Amino acid sequence: MTVREKAELIVKDIKKEQETNPVVIFKHIAKKEYVSIHGPEHHILDGASLLVAYKNAGGEIDLEQALDRLMAEGLRMPGAMCGLWGICGAITSIGAALAIIDGTGPLSMDGTWGNHMQFTSKAIGELGTINGPRCCKRDAMIAFKNGIDYVNAHYGVILQYEQMQCEFTDFNEQCIKERCPFYE
């Protein structure tokens, strides 16, 4: 199955979610057979989970249009960018979702451009402290924690968050176990 096919299934299935906690939405979809333990489909799944939770919490967006745009942006992000480019796709996916919510672009001067950069640098700093190897599930949880804090501080909606233990350890051959803040 191609990344595009996985992305289309993610977008189709995620529209059915009713939660205001993006981590719960993420876990529902991440357990589906078409989502790999690691892979570039997370570049769509992570931001899409945030967008759906935002909409469900009362955020004003055209969800159909937002998910289409997020899928297009996520498909431009290559796999392994964390190791090859030094930036995590989970974090860039959440950053893309924030840009969609705010209508931010490269020439934006309303403060959102800088705010998104601050979100990204804070989240990537946490990942850097934990260190590798990559884990798309752990990295998503760090991105969500920071993304939820950002949404709750900036948008007048409240997304739910609670730190949950990882349910994917047994499927990850490179799990860092005790070094991971989500390890059971």
What do these predicted regions represent?
Residues 101-102, 106-152:
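A structural-propensity feature for long, helix-poor, extended segments
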Residues 151-162, 169-177:
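C-terminal auxiliary extensions adjacent to catalytic cores
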Residues 42, 80-96:
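Conserved phosphate/anionic-ligand binding catalytic regions in large, soluble enzymes, centered on
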